[in-house]
Swiss-Prot record:
PROSITE patterns recorded: RIBOSOMAL_L1
Function: Binds directly to 23S rRNA. The L1 stalk is quite mobile in the ribosome, and is involved in E site tRNA release. Protein L1 is also a translational repressor protein, it controls the translation of the L11 operon by binding to its mRNA.
Domain of life: Bacteria
Matches recorded under InterPro entries: Ribosom_uL1_bac-type, Ribosomal_uL1, Ribosomal_uL1-like, Ribosomal_uL1/biogenesis, Ribosomal_uL1_3-a/b-sand, Ribosomal_uL1_CS
Keyword list, A-Z: Repressor, Ribonucleoprotein, Ribosomal protein, RNA-binding, rRNA-binding, Translation regulation, tRNA-binding
GO biological process, one term: regulation of translation
Cellular component, GO annotation: large ribosomal subunit
Gene3D superfamilies, per database record: 3.30.190.20, 3.40.50.790
MF terms in GO: rRNA binding; structural constituent of ribosome; tRNA binding
Species for this entry: Staphylococcus aureus (strain N315)
Subunit description: Part of the 50S ribosomal subunit.
Name of the protein: Large ribosomal subunit protein uL1
Family: Belongs to the universal ribosomal protein uL1 family.
Entry-linked HAMAP family: Ribosomal_uL1_B (MF_01318_B)
Length: 230
């Protein structure tokens, strides 16, 4: 494993690895220890007390963060008929039918999110092996398989983020950029944490929020005290 650079070591020395900080303190410290020479993303990782091998403990969904993520998301919509005009009016970057299936099969991936109307899923299903591993396959749970393409596109453009618990029960998500104010990041964090709290499976036993940490791109992780979490 490569040794971390001097800038990282200096930044990490400001973080007490034995301490669990309040949300406010952790976000402030994560911003202060950002070492990237660009407007880094602020990421959070929630380790949840769930068993993702059980169908009723798989957590997946999407939430619109009140202050967005600071990242412009490029959207591809699979639709036909009047839904094409609806998607265009909502501000989608690309919209169409089978022609985009062919483009993707040929290696085109100039988009971040895929939305599809239910009647297009037969075509989109052909791309399962390509879109699935990249986390781009439309899914009703995240609101990306819908007839309301206007709402779907507008929410994505407004800062909607998808979340999904990985095998170890960890949910990773971006809550903004280092250039955001502390208040904006705290509000985004609280919104995501509240959504995850409400998504707790009834069959999950013991401590739900096992550990939470916030970090910036290339920066050290800062542990958050979960004692006050519901």
């Amino acid at each position: 494993m490569a040794k971390k650079g001097k800038k990282y070591q200096e930044a990490a020395s400001k973080v007490d690895r034995t301490q669990h900080y309040s949300v406010e303190e952790a976000i402030k410290l994560a911003k202060e220890t950002s070492i990237a020479n660009f407007d880094a993303s602020v990421e959070v990782a929630f380790r949840l007390g769930i068993d993702t091998r059980k169908n009723d403990q798989q957590i997946r969904g999407a939430v619109v963060l009140p202050n967005g993520t600071g990242k412009s998301q490029s959207v591809l919509v699979f639709a036909k008929g009047d839904k094409i005009a609806e998607a265009e009016a909502a501000g989608t970057d690309y919209v169409g039918e089978a022609e985009y299936v062919q483009k993707i099969q040929q290696g085109w991936f100039d988009f971040d999110v895929v939305v599809a109307t239910p009647d297009m899923m037969g075509e989109v299903g052909k791309l399962g092996r390509v879109l699935g591993p990249k986390g781009l396959m439309p899914n009703p749970k995240t609101g990306t398989v819908t007839m309301d393409v206007k709402k779907a596109v507008e929410e994505i453009k407004a800062g909607k983020v998808e979340y999904r618990a990985e095998k170890a029960g960890i949910v990773h998500a971006s809550i903004g950029k280092v250039s955001f104010t502390d208040e904006q990041l705290i509000e985004n964090f609280n919104t995501l944490q509240d959504v995850l709290a409400k998504a707790k499976p009834s069959s999950a036993k013991g401590t739900y929020f096992k550990s939470v940490a916030v970090t910036t791109t290339m920066g050290p992780g800062v542990k958050i005290d979960t004692a006050s979490f519901k």
